[in-house]
């Protein structure tokens, strides 16, 4: 897959941009703060419906405007599709494929695929579990687009279950974990409230287990498929370092281990386990029942994929806290490259985006990275200064300076104004 055209209007610093792209390597060069990252961020947003830099869509809309537009034409095995997204500072976004309106922006998932690495990815190694869950979920919805709706439904059900645990805490505590027969001493009204809350909690348990099981099973499959690519790419980037490995860890690991399923594997050469949705659902449902007194007491959901994590192992130690700065960078970059090679194996090769990456790598790692990306159909790179561009790329890459792109956009806008004036005459 490659992107042949990218158009932006009122997206962050870009009032207008109409960019023709081709397979191969394209580099956007310019000082920090001048808009080069905004270009690749926009393409990444179209692919994943989220930004790697901010959580709020409002930040993506140019100051003083209400709507930002992103359009990209993707070419996959000779077939062209154009994805268009109107991002609203307030209200719901609007999506089109070619000229057809979509019911949801989630319908765009899979039209454009990207693997984006940026300095923020260091948080994959050093940050909190939420960062690693987000990494897996971005791959999940690209690989299995229908699970985007499952994830949204899970998040909604989780909020409602937590609200029930908080709002009905008094009634639930009277019956959950209480001695047998104690409910006989309760008034009819309180007993009715407690029974209603319990029945509703049972419903949310079932929904959360069914939805969460699909997410867990997909994540475990992704980790299983990523692990060998991670080992290979890390070995290529840092041949003198310890071997890298990854495994999935869940809040129901103990229950799964009782069934003979051990997700957490710390040895680099051992394959990670798989988990079927059916087993995950049954195990989650039983775990909810066992954990109910603690959840009622604390007023929150203690089990499920929203609390899971990924073990990132370097040698025999966790990468978090034990990896050096250089090893952490290489590990984070290897995770992104592993995702690229895995998706290539699936039959749909994503566009590789490297946002200000080479500035953080020594000459040896730069060359290893160039070797790894040389076979990709399309690579988009940003660099703040020319010195950050590896020599091996200078003769083969198309290099745009941000000033060139801004001047081109300005000329296009001026022509449009003149054409409008001519039409008025």
UniProtKB/Swiss-Prot annotation:
Keywords: ATP-binding, Cytoplasm, DNA damage, DNA repair, DNA replication, DNA-binding, Nucleotide-binding, SOS response
Residues the record lists as binding ATP: 30-37
SUPFAM superfamilies the UniProt entry points to: P-loop containing nucleoside triphosphate hydrolases
Purpose: The RecF protein is involved in DNA metabolism; it is required for DNA replication and normal SOS inducibility. RecF binds preferentially to single-stranded, linear DNA. It also seems to bind ATP.
Protein name: DNA replication and repair protein RecF
A single cellular component GO annotation: cytoplasm
Alphabetized NCBIfam families for the sequence: recf
MF GO annotations: ATP binding; single-stranded DNA binding
Family matches, as PANTHER family: DNA REPLICATION AND REPAIR PROTEIN RECF (PTHR32182:SF0)
One GO term (biological process): DNA replication
Pfam family, one: SMC_N
Family in the record: Belongs to the RecF family.
Subcellular location: Cytoplasm
Source organism per UniProt: Corynebacterium jeikeium (strain K411)
């Amino acid at each position: 897959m490659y992107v042949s055209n990218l158009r932006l209007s009122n997206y962050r610093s870009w009032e207008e941009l109409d960019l023709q792209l081709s397979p191969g390597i394209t580099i956007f060069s310019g000082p920090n703060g001048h808009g080069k990252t905004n270009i690749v961020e926009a393409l990444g947003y179209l692919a994943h419906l989220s930004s790697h830099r901010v959580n709020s869509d409002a930040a993506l809309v140019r100051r003083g405007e209400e709507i930002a537009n992103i359009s990209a034409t993707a070419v996959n095995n000779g077939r062209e599709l154009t994805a268009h997204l109107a991002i609203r500072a307030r209200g719901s976004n609007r999506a089109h494929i070619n000229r057809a309106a979509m019911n949801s922006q989630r319908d765009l998932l899979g039209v454009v695929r990207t693997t984006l690495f940026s300095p923020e990815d260091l948080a994959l190694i050093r940050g909190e579990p939420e960062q690693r869950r987000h990494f897996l979920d971005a791959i999940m919805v690209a690989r299995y687009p229908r699970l985007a709706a499952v994830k949204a439904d899970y998040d909604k059900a989780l909020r409602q279950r937590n609200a029930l645990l908080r709002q009905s805490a008094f009634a639930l505590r009277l019956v959950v974990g209480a001695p047998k027969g104690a409910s006989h001493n309760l008034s009819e009204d309180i007993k009715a409230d407690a029974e209603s809350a319990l029945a509703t909690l049972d419903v949310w348990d079932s929904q959360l287990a069914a939805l969460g099981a699909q997410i867990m099973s997909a994540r475990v499959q992704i980790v299983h498929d990523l692990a060998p690519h991670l080992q290979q790419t890390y070995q290529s980037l840092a041949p003198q370092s310890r071997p890298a490995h990854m495994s999935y860890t869940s809040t129901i690991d103990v229950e799964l281990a009782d069934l003979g399923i051990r997700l957490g594997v710390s040895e680099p050469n051992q394959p990670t386990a798989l988990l079927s949705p059916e087993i995950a659902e049954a195990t989650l449902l039983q775990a909810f029942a066992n954990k109910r007194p603690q959840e009622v007491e604390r007023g929150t959901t203690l089990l499920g994929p929203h609390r899971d994590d990924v073990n990132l192992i370097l040698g025999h130690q966790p990468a978090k806290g034990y990896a050096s700065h250089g090893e952490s960078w290489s590990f984070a970059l290897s995770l992104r490259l592993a995702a690229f090679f895995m998706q290539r194996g699936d039959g749909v090769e994503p566009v590789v985006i490297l946002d200000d990456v080479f500035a953080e790598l020594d000459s040896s790692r730069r060359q290893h990275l160039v070797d790894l990306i040389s076979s990709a159909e399309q690579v988009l790179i940003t660099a703040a200064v020319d010195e950050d561009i590896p020599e091996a790329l200078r003769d083969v890459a198309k290099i745009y300076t941000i000033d060139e792109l801004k001047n081109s956009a300005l000329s296009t806008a001026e022509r449009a104004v003149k054409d409008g004036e001519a039409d008025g005459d």
